[in-house]
Amino acid sequence: PKGIIVGDYYSGQKVFDGGYEAYAEVVVNNGEIVHIELNERPPLTYYASEWAGETKRRSGYGFFQAKSPRTDYTLVTLINGMSYLEWQVLKNQKLDFEYKTLFGSSNSARNGFVPLLKEMSKEVQGKTSNKRYVGITQPYDSGISTRLEVIYENGKIVDLKYDEIFADDKKDIKNKTLQEFYR
């Protein structure tokens, strides 16, 4: 996301397939879904110990998965699959519909994200949340964007997140020592 996003905040979590956790955050402003972000955390027993118990979305997991021989065949990573589901939600402006999934990330979608989003649909469509979301993302010419997210509940800050998001392409990052961190 770029710019400023404001709205009612909804979040959910679902445990699936022996300990994987699917997460969803949805922001609605004046009846319109303006932001959605999915994430996944594998169990502590995950076969690749460096990712066991760690969220995958904005980590090096996408690079790890892209190096897998299986990915050579599918050309899809979990992050691609999450982005595709998010795009469908924003396009359809609802959470409860027939999702399409990408081969190579469909287990997480079918067993985690899609059931979670369908469970959340009644809450998101049914009532105003007592949590508010303010997110600001500012891109810079350096190839790095800063992102600040603040979640309020009853007028008090209950969560605060800050992240620096590196460009998708190494050459867009001006500082050579930071180029290895491209998305």
Segments (PLM) and residue ranges:
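Active-site- and interface-proximal helix/loop "cap" or "latch" segments in soluble metabolic
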Residues: 1-6, 12-130, 134-183
